[in-house]
């Protein structure tokens, strides 16, 4: 398929974080762009402000008439049900209908692609990498699964020859990509509703890794069962961070690579997982040819990604952090980062589980990760694309949490409880609509 022959791009599910980045991209390169989504959001409002027509009812009559021509590309998200009338209309009339991952595949085939894979850390690592390349003057476009604070966008740059993409393992989407340089951050079990078991996930990551022809351009966290250049901290990795210290809330560290020693790099995101994310981005950028000085400057200026250990309130006696974590390993990483920064403070965690299947598959691990906090408030499960599973609910999960300071709460009870709390650090955690509550939570807690 030749994108140059496409004049119109219509999105079904345009408000998703990945879909909206693609919509911005196609608008930027001069295509006519419009779309449908189920509900209005901050992202859809921003797209409408940029000149993209969006409607919120599954109704063929609301699609602009000039999209009913053969040079229209229709892009769908996996979250859209098969009964969706707009989707079926385009399918039945044999329009070009593609998944988002397939379209990214078409784009990366025609560009130099740097792909970031892994069950955790994709968004932060690809954001750091996109920032490094953009700041160093590369002709790059980075498609990000989150809003990067430096740009207030999920799209970095407008380059035509280099792309940075998140290689998403969900539905084996990353196998559509054509990576020239790639990394794998982690290979923990997830999406068992798709894969069935851990072995199938690992096999899929290996298949992705095999798409990188030159294994000197595949970077893997030390210990993963993949052949590539190893990356780690204080170990025997080929790209290794050492002499790590914290000064005034910043990581300062040295890096030894196969060809050089880099001294006193400065990076502002807390947590050891973020340090290795930065190290992966450094290794990929250095291999791409970015000068060390440019990498160092960009690492120091990187502000982070919204909802990734995002400080909402940072006062001397009270802190509120918001994070997108939705897997036990990610919650552990949030906990580690909080304890590293605030070792003697009382930490309250609010968690909204995401997906019934994920809650069921990892219930014991979720319980262990949540039990580490001083106090836990648990919201109802956010279903996203799923129907309920009998017996799987937040009360069932809470029973497994070994902590006497735990409570099941409804959304309308949350803010009053937080205002009464004596916790000096509050963290909201989850990938569901808890993110839409953050503005109000911040507003109310700012008065504490």
From Swiss-Prot:
InterPro entries xref list: Mur-like_cat_sf, Mur_ligase_C, Mur_ligase_C_dom_sf, Mur_ligase_cen, Mur_ligase_N, MurCDEF_pg_biosynth, UDP-N-AcMur_Ala_ligase_MurC
Q: Which reaction does it catalyse?
A: UDP-N-acetyl-alpha-D-muramate + L-alanine + ATP = UDP-N-acetyl-alpha-D-muramoyl-L-alanine + ADP + phosphate + H(+)
Entry EC no(s): 6.3.2.8
Q: Where is the protein localized?
A: Cytoplasm
Question: Which pathway does UniProt place it in?
Answer: Cell wall biogenesis; peptidoglycan biosynthesis
The superkingdom of the source organism is Bacteria
- Might you name a Gene Ontology BP term for this protein? peptidoglycan biosynthetic process
* Enzyme class of the recorded protein, top EC level: ligase
What molecular function does GO assign, one term?
UDP-N-acetylmuramate-L-alanine ligase activity
| Pfam families per record | Mur_ligase (PF01225), Mur_ligase_C (PF02875), Mur_ligase_M (PF08245)
- List keywords of the entry alphabetically: ATP-binding, Cell cycle, Cell division, Cell shape, Cell wall biogenesis/degradation, Cytoplasm, Ligase, Nucleotide-binding, Peptidoglycan synthesis
Name the residues that bind ATP: 118-124
A GO cellular component annotation here is: cytoplasm
Q: What does this protein do?
A: Cell wall formation.
HAMAP family per record: MurC
The similarity annotation says: Belongs to the MurCDEF family.
Name of the featured protein = UDP-N-acetylmuramate--L-alanine ligase
Tell me the classification of the organism that encodes this protein: Bacteria, Pseudomonadati, Bacteroidota, Flavobacteriia, Flavobacteriales
């Amino acid at each position: 398929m030749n994108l140059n022959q496409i004049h119109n791009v219509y999105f079904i599910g345009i408000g998703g974080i990945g879909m909206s980045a693609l919509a911005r991209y196609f608008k930027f390169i001069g295509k006519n762009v419009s779309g449908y989504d189920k509900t209005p959001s901050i992202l859809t409002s921003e797209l409408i402000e940029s000149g993209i027509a969006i409607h919120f009812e599954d109704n063929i009559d609301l699609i602009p008439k000039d999209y009913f021509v053969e040079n229209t590309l229709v892009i769908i998200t996996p979250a859209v049900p098969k009964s969706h009338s707009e989707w079926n209309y385009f399918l039945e009339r044999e329009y070009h209908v593609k998944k988002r991952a397939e379209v990214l595949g078409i784009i990366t085939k025609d560009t130099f692609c740097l792909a970031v894979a892994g069950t955790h850390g994709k968004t932060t690592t690809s954001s750091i990498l996109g920032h490094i390349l953009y700041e160093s003057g590369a002709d790059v476009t980075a498609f990000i699964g989150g809003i990067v604070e430096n740009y207030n966008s999920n799209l970095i740059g407008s380059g035509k020859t280099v792309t940075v993409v998140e290689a998403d393992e969900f539905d084996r989407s990353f196998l559509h990509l054509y990576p020239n340089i790639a990394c794998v951050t982690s290979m923990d079990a997830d999406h068992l509703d798709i894969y069935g078991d851990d072995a199938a996930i690992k096999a899929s990551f290996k298949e992705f890794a095999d798409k990188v022809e030159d294994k000197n351009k595949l970077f893997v966290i030390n210990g993963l069962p993949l052949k590539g250049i190893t990356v780690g901290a204080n170990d025997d990795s080929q790209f290794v961070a050492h002499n790590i210290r914290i000064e005034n809330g910043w990581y300062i560290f040295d890096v030894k690579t196969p060809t050089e020693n880099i001294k006193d790099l400065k990076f502002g995101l807390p947590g050891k997982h973020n340090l290795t994310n930065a190290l992966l981005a450094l290794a990929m950028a250095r291999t791409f040819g970015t000068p060390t000085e440019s990498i160092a400057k960009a690492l120091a200026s990187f502000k982070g990604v919204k909802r990734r250990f995002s400080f909402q309130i940072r006062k001397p006696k009270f802190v509120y952090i918001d994070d997108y974590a939705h897997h036990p390993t990610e919650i552990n990483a949030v906990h580690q980062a909080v304890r590293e920064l605030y070792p003697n403070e009382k930490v309250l965690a609010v968690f909204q589980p995401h997906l019934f299947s994920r809650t069921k598959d990892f219930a014991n691990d979720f319980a262990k990760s949540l039990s580490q906090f001083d106090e836990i408030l648990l919201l109802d499960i956010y279903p996203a694309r799923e129907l309920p599973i009998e017996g799987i609910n937040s009360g069932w999960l809470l029973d497994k949490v070994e902590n006497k300071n735990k409570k099941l709460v409804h959304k309308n009870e949350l803010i009053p409880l937080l205002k009464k709390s004596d916790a000096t650090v509050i963290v909201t955690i989850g990938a569901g609509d808890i993110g839409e509550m953050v503005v109000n939570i911040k507003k109310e807690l700012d008065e504490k």
